[in-house]
Amino acid sequence: MTDFSPREIVSELDRFIVGQTDAKRAVSIALRNRWRRQQLEGSLREEVLPKNILMIGPTGVGKTEIARRLAKLANAPFLKVEATKFTEVGYVGRDVEQIVRDLVEVAIAQVRERKRKDVQARAQLAAEERVLDALVGANASSATRESFRKKLRAGELNDKEIEIETQSSGGGMPMFEIPGMPGAQMGAISIGDIFGKLGGRSKTRRLTVESSHEILINEESDKLLDTEQLTLEAISAVENNGIVFLDEIDKICARDGRVGGDVSREGVQRDLLPLIEGTTVSTKHGAVKTDHILFIASGAFHVAKPSDLLPELQGRLPIRVELQALTRDDMRRILTEPEASLIKQYVALMQTEGVTLDITDNAIDALADVAVAVNSTVENIGARRLQTVMERVLDEISFTAPDRNGETIRVDADFVQKHVGDLAKNADLSRFIL
C-alpha cells in the first residue's frame, strides 16, 4: 500500500493529467484514507468503511486516465472494469462477482512478484545448477562443473543452446462453464485444473543459455514460495486495500420509457448493490469479503443523469466529483505539459526515422483551436480530438518519413491550416473525417 500524502499523489497525477484538481484531490484523499485505516487498532479499523466515489464529467476529460495513473501509484490490488460488460446473475454473460475474482488474481500476481524478489538469490543459484546440468550433465566432475560455472558467470556461454525441462503453463487449456456446478459460480473451470495432475505438466524446450535464465529463475522462485501463504496474503490485500474502478456506470442507467427490468442495466445495478455495500464472494482461492474494497465509479452522464441510478446505488457512492469540460487553454497544455504529451510522442517517433520535427508555438495554438472548434460543432469528445487532428496534420510526414532521413521539418500554424483548416470549417466533412 502506498504511503504517499494526498499532496504527493496529486503532484504525481499532475505529471500526466492536465487540470481536474477536484477529482485528483478526491482520489488522493480516498487513497490516503486506506493507509490511515491500516494504522488504526482492532474493532475501530473494522468500522471505518471506504467512502466510494462517483466521477461525473464529459468524455475525454481524464476520468479513465486518472484511474490508469492511480493504479500504478496505489501499489495495491487495482482493477479497472467497464460496467457495460456485465449482465444480471442468471443470464448469459459475466456477473458482477467476477470483478472480485479478477481482483484476487491481480493480487496473487502482485504478491508473487514481490515474494519472488525475496528468494531471488537462492533461485539464481538453483537455476545456475540446472543450466550446468544441461551443459555438462548431472554426473560431471566437480572440477568440470566449476570451470563451466566460471565461464557461465563471465557470460561466455550465453549464446550456447541447451535443452531444459520447463513447467507447462497450461495456457493452452480451454476454459468452460458447467451450468449448475459449484465451480461455475467461482468462474470458468479450466480443463487444466481437472486433468493437470495426470501428467504432461512439463515439456522440453531448446533455448540459449541467456534466454533460459529468466524462465528458470521464475520456476525456481515459485518452488521456494509457499503457495497457501501467498494466496492468504493476496486475499487479505484485496479485502483491505483493493480498489475497483467502474467505468461507464452511466451506460447501465435505465432507459427512459422502458417498463420492467433490464438484464444489462438495472439488473447489473441491483447486483452491484451488495458488492459495494459489503458481501462475501466465493472464489476458487477462498471467500473474499468486499466490505473494505474502495469503488470508484465514473460516467459521462451526457444522456442519463446521476439521479437515474438506483437510489440505493447513489447512496453507496457518497462522494461526487464533477470533472470540467476542457477549455482551449487546457487543450494547449495537454499538447505540451504531460511527461508523455502528444507533441513529445510524435517528435520521438519521427526521430526513429532520422526526421526532426520542429513544432512551433503557433502550430500548437492552431492545433488547440481546431480541436476546440470541431468539438463545439460536431461532438465533444474532449482531449481525444487532439489525437485525430494530430494524425491528420502529420499524415503526409508519417507516410514519407523513411525517404526524408536527415531532414528537419517545420510545422507551424500555416502548415496546420493547410492540412485541416478547410475540414474544420466544413462541419459536414469534419463530422466524418475529424
Swiss-Prot record:
<dbReference type="Pfam" id="PF10431">
    <property type="entry name" value="ClpB_D2-small"/>
</dbReference>
<dbReference type="InterPro" id="IPR003959">
    <property type="entry name" value="ATPase_AAA_core"/>
</dbReference>
<feature type="binding site">
    <location>
        <position position="312"/>
    </location>
    <ligand>
        <name>ATP</name>
    </ligand>
</feature>
<feature type="binding site">
    <location>
        <position position="18"/>
    </location>
    <ligand>
        <name>ATP</name>
    </ligand>
</feature>
<dbReference type="GO" id="GO:0051603">
    <property type="term" value="P:proteolysis involved in protein catabolic process"/>
</dbReference>
<dbReference type="Pfam" id="PF07724">
    <property type="entry name" value="AAA_2"/>
</dbReference>
<feature type="binding site">
    <location>
        <position position="247"/>
    </location>
    <ligand>
        <name>ATP</name>
    </ligand>
</feature>
<comment type="function">
    <text>ATPase subunit of a proteasome-like degradation complex; this subunit has chaperone activity. The binding of ATP and its subsequent hydrolysis by HslU are essential for unfolding of protein substrates subsequently hydrolyzed by HslV. HslU recognizes the N-terminal part of its protein substrates and unfolds these before they are guided to HslV for hydrolysis.</text>
</comment>
<dbReference type="InterPro" id="IPR004491">
    <property type="entry name" value="HslU"/>
</dbReference>
<dbReference type="InterPro" id="IPR019489">
    <property type="entry name" value="Clp_ATPase_C"/>
</dbReference>
<dbReference type="InterPro" id="IPR027417">
    <property type="entry name" value="P-loop_NTPase"/>
</dbReference>
<keyword id="KW-0963">Cytoplasm</keyword>
<dbReference type="GO" id="GO:0016887">
    <property type="term" value="F:ATP hydrolysis activity"/>
</dbReference>
<dbReference type="GO" id="GO:0043335">
    <property type="term" value="P:protein unfolding"/>
</dbReference>
<dbReference type="GO" id="GO:0036402">
    <property type="term" value="F:proteasome-activating activity"/>
</dbReference>
<dbReference type="Pfam" id="PF00004">
    <property type="entry name" value="AAA"/>
</dbReference>
<dbReference type="GO" id="GO:0005524">
    <property type="term" value="F:ATP binding"/>
</dbReference>
<keyword id="KW-0143">Chaperone</keyword>
<dbReference type="InterPro" id="IPR050052">
    <property type="entry name" value="ATP-dep_Clp_protease_ClpX"/>
</dbReference>
<comment type="subunit">
    <text>A double ring-shaped homohexamer of HslV is capped on each side by a ring-shaped HslU homohexamer. The assembly of the HslU/HslV complex is dependent on binding of ATP.</text>
</comment>
<protein>
    <recommendedName>
        <fullName>ATP-dependent protease ATPase subunit HslU</fullName>
    </recommendedName>
</protein>
<comment type="similarity">
    <text>Belongs to the ClpX chaperone family. HslU subfamily.</text>
</comment>
<feature type="binding site">
    <location>
        <position position="384"/>
    </location>
    <ligand>
        <name>ATP</name>
    </ligand>
</feature>
<keyword id="KW-0067">ATP-binding</keyword>
<dbReference type="GO" id="GO:0008233">
    <property type="term" value="F:peptidase activity"/>
</dbReference>
<dbReference type="GO" id="GO:0009376">
    <property type="term" value="C:HslUV protease complex"/>
</dbReference>
<feature type="binding site">
    <location>
        <begin position="60"/>
        <end position="65"/>
    </location>
    <ligand>
        <name>ATP</name>
    </ligand>
</feature>
<keyword id="KW-0547">Nucleotide-binding</keyword>
<dbReference type="InterPro" id="IPR003593">
    <property type="entry name" value="AAA+_ATPase"/>
</dbReference>
